[in-house]
């Protein structure tokens, strides 16, 4: 999650040139009775921080493990196999339950996106990770079926790390595409696909890989080749399953002409706190930026789902930039200027926000809902946290800041 939008900004200059010729804003994928039509509207939420840990979503787990635990790799290495398995099993069994899926459905969602790491299905020698996640993913599929929700299974971490972020399992240098890491990723993906794609009444899509970081050094040509391999795996197992492809921090239009008409959906992510310009905006600026992004993705020749976004406009949340890393907003990160004061907003509830903060958050969320439904919808990041109000859909819904019903608008026509 770190630097997501700022890295997108790095490539903005060349994204506007050399693009494919103009195409309709929506192209058709074949509709099938047993699956979801991704030419329609996805309304859903990510189950983040559950089967792949992130320090800012569950800071207590990482804080209790000591300073060295900054991602799932170092957490499990610090705790050791036995203690790590005990800690994670307790987390997996309590953080998300069937009741969460019922709440998500009752709020009007039709999808959940569930991140999973390669280590859950394909352990490699000399790695500290523990497994056991698949039992809970199995439960989640059953819970989704009972709740009437569709599932996107998201391969969130690859061997070597595809982005260098803690949400890949291991932060630091990007080593994916080195050695055997791509073939190892394909093997892990195939294991997931063989286990879950036959349940096509619920698992209607699977994501090839979350946020491969092209600006950070991932080869675009190599990524396209990997995507071709993944599509072949899916078609061999279940030709009716749609494949989500990350834009790799490029524009969705830069992927025009690639696998168009092959039941693929572009996944793009939009955050406004990981970029020095965006974090400086007032609420009017944030609304305009979200609306502009919605117009930008309309140029894709494939369905586009904004697969991650939030109601946050600062990086004040504890550990958001990484455990022990400071904030841009307060001018403490990478020689930033100061844009404001985090005050008591590093952790807490939506109920703790001021009236103005709740109003601004609601306005920003509504703008994004309208913008992203101009194409093919959205998946909010994330359902639940230990106290990150701009990111916690469950808490936002409970406090009337996330629209309920989803079409309710206190600030209509912001993107008109």
Curated annotation (Swiss-Prot):
Q: Catalysed reaction per UniProt?
A: Successive hydrolysis of beta-D-glucose units from the non-reducing ends of (1->3)-beta-D-glucans, releasing alpha-glucose
Which Pfam families does the record associate with it? Answer: Cellulase
Q: Name one GO molecular function term.
A: glucan exo-1,3-beta-glucosidase activity
Localization per Swiss-Prot or TrEMBL: Secreted
Its Enzyme Commission number(s) read 3.2.1.58
List cofactor names only. Answer: Mn(2+)
**Listed InterPro entries:** Glyco_hydro_5, Glycoside_hydrolase_SF, Glycosyl_hydrolase_5
Annotated SUPFAM superfamilies: (Trans)glycosidases
Q: Which family is it part of? A: Belongs to the glycosyl hydrolase 5 (cellulase A) family.
Q: What is this protein called?
A: Probable glucan 1,3-beta-glucosidase A
Name its species: Aspergillus fumigatus (strain CBS 144.89 / FGSC A1163 / CEA10)
